[in-house]
From Swiss-Prot:
This is Cortexillin-2. Actin-bundling protein. When linked to F-actin the actin filaments form preferentially anti-parallel bundles that associate into meshworks. Plays a major role in cytokinesis. The keyword Transcription does not apply. GO terms for molecular function: actin binding. Signal peptide: none annotated. Residues 1-231 are annotated as: Actin-binding. Keywords: Actin-binding, Coiled coil, Cytoplasm, Cytoskeleton, Repeat. It comes from Heterostelium pallidum (strain ATCC 26659 / Pp 5 / PN500) (Cellular slime mold).
Amino acid sequence: MTDLHKEWEKVQEMAFASWVNSVLEKRGGVEKISDVSTDLSDGVKLIFFLESVSGKKFPKKFDLEPKTRILRIQNLHLAMLFVDEDLKVKVQGVAAEEFVDNNKKMILGFLWTLYRKYRISVINEGDKSSEEGLLAWVKKTTDGYSGVNITNFKASFRDGNAYLALAHKFDPSVFKYDEFSGKDQIERLNAAFDFAEKGLGIPKLLDAESLSKGNVDERSIILYTSLFFHAYRAKEEREALEASQNSLANKLASLEQSLEGEKTSQDELARQKKELEESLRLIRQQNEQRNQRIADIQSKIDDALRGIDDEKMAKLDLESRLSKTEKDKAILELKLAETLDENERLRNKIEEDKKRAAAEAEGLGLLRTHIGHQITDIAKWQSFLDNPEAVPYTKTPVNLEAELASLQFEEQAKRLGSKVENENISLEKYLSLKEEELKSAGAPKKRTK
């Protein structure tokens, strides 16, 4: 292992032990650790640390006093699952056995991953975060200090001016920054480390000579510098808390003064108490009355809801009946339409029958008149032939009209036709007879011998 790696490992051990202890101290009731490679091997303190640093409750039950290797591995396995599944932190190649076997390299790698997530990744300055955000924060914080030029972690911190400026900016009353301008790099670095340890509570993680020569791993510089950032943030939080406490104290003092100035006599307080008690009694009475009204209203609502349910059932029944009625109505309308069509057909037929009857009546009248004339003419001929000197007959015999009046149209027509035919036959016979008589009268009689 190279000296650089050894230095980096030493820095990590000190930094991570300090970080873990600061987290466990806030939790309370947990003994501090001194060696990260051995004091986390049973998984108990590691689980407490993970809960506190993440703010999440450990979801599984674990053994608080694991006596055997298997029980310690079980605890650590649950811790690894918690990191992976709940904290969403991916740690490659680190298993529970690494902690049980005190594999310092793997344990430090595991803690470095957690440190980057919870202590470096949370650093933001402007539009930059993590390492870039940390570098931007240092540049902003040390702005205006002579001899400070922040460009990167590898070269910008070797002369000690950056760390001196950070320590001075934190508390300018401790020392004067300019008094170290003539000192060499190692002196400035050692002074900065001393001021940081005493004023900011930052442990001496780096070796001044190694840092001045550029023999310190960049990750060690980032880790040490991040402690300044969190010291500043802790100071800001303390100042904000103190300001809040002072504000609260001022408000309490003002309130006490107001109360002192507004004290009233015991009689006034007693009177106010009595009034309040009476008001309270009235309020309780009103509450009881209101509760009773609410109960009555609720009862009415329940009745109304039951009525609504009944109405719904009645509505469904009515809708069912209406549906059947609509069907019946459609059938009746169809039958009505058919009936109306039939009535129309019958009216038309009646009209036609009326017209036909009128025509038949008119024809019958004409036929009766015509037949009557014929009968009259026949009667005239009969009368004339019987008595040529007699007045011509002009009236249809009465017995014929009476006979026809009692018959239907077809019977009248048939009777008249038969009558005319009979009259014609009678007339022909009569004429034949007369003709024979005339012939007989005109022929010479035979002489008798």
